Amino acid sequence: MEFLDLPGRSRASGTVRLPGSKSISNRVLLLAALAEGVTDVYDVLDSDDTRYMLAALQALGVGVEDRGDNHWRVTGVAGAFPARQAELFLGNAGTAFRPLTAVLALSGGDYVLDGVARMHERPIGDLVDALRQLGGRIDYRGTLGFPPLHVHPPQAGADVAHIRGNVSSQFLTGLLMALPLRRLRTRVEVVGELISKPYIEITLAMLRRFGVEVARDGWQAFSVAADACYRSPREIYVEGDASSASYFLAAGAIGGGPVRVEGVGRDSVQGDVGFADALAAMGARIAMGPNWIEACAPAQGRLKAIDLDCNAIPDAAMTLAVAALFADGTTTLRNIASWRVKETDRIAAMATELRKVGATVEEGDDFLRVTPPETLRAGAVIDTYDDHRMAMCLSLVSLGGVAVRINDPGCVAKTFPGYFNAFAEIAR
């Protein structure tokens, strides 16, 4: 297995230009494909997950042209994919798999969607059930409720669908993106609490950019009009990735700073910019502009522990678990059940790896409680579980002045291929 040895460091400062947001990149690429007209998409994230989406769109007959420098020109199909049959391999890209499942289920072709072994363990039954209510015809090719899937042309369905909100916000995102293809007024009602609401806000904002306004009743019901259709905005710029910003902001809070990230800020549509507020609650000094955020360590003393509901920042909250190693007291992260159905079971994985460096960790179904050791244990070998965020989060341990080995560092290619180079630039 490949590994990367990170030397112990104690300072962090500098400026990082963030890569494009994964969540926004894949939404925009799919919407541009469905729209009427040509869309120039700038600052697209170059990563495994976006490559899977681009390859899928090409297989479906969409014109996608690489114009260089993360600029893609997408020629929209105005709702109907030219390829009526295709087999799509989508790796472990939930931001591609879930929306494409919904769109293809309502678009009138015969398609197979598959992914890596971990994707076969990530639930999709709630989305499939909702699509079936709308007339979708979807078969499981393996375990009931999980990929791979075989999608057939839809039949007539209801004008209301119900979907559970507490498993993955990507299910609702996929449904909302697919609804304009029906050309019927359709209402989606959320059963129970909707998790990760900021990701739905991203979806609604992107649909609006492509000409579709979703009417909503709080967070419990969403409606799309019969005449809704996607129209190209001609050009669109992708924000920097706010989840990726969390590692560098935490580095500034741990290693003195200032560390500035460029590409997200006060004007961001991404909920993970709320990570900066969590760091501030821990005592970090935070400054923010429209398109940048800067973090420094507390003026005096160490960070302090927090007890936080992380529903709104599920991905960035992972970084808080590692920041807790550098805080006085016991940090509790709550409402993180969605971690268990991500690229790996992130609650179990994080608990295991934090214990390797000496932390006392308690894990529950939907919480993680971290008490730092008096001294971090040097020489830990960190396993990453083919999970990009595990690798990036746990690199921060090295800012405690201890060397760490990161196994399979290449897994960061899922969202941030240049992460370790960027980290080396700011770690002193």
UniProtKB/Swiss-Prot annotation:
Residue positions binding 3-phosphoshikimate: 22-23, 27, 168-170, 196, 315, 342
PROSITE patterns: EPSP_SYNTHASE_1, EPSP_SYNTHASE_2
Gene3D superfamilies: Enolpyruvate transferase domain
Catalytic site positions: 315 (proton acceptor)
Subcellular localization(s) per the UniProt record: Cytoplasm
Keyword DNA repair: no
Keyword Oxidoreductase found: no
Reactions it catalyzes: 3-phosphoshikimate + phosphoenolpyruvate = 5-O-(1-carboxyvinyl)-3-phosphoshikimate + phosphate
Enzyme class of the recorded protein, top EC level: transferase
Highest rank taxon of the organism: Bacteria
Binding of phosphoenolpyruvate, residues: 22, 94, 122, 170, 346, 389, 414
Family the entry assigns: Belongs to the EPSP synthase family.
Stored NCBIfam families: aroA
Subunit (UniProt): Monomer.
Protein name as it appears in the record: 3-phosphoshikimate 1-carboxyvinyltransferase
Organism: Thiobacillus denitrificans (strain ATCC 25259 / T1)
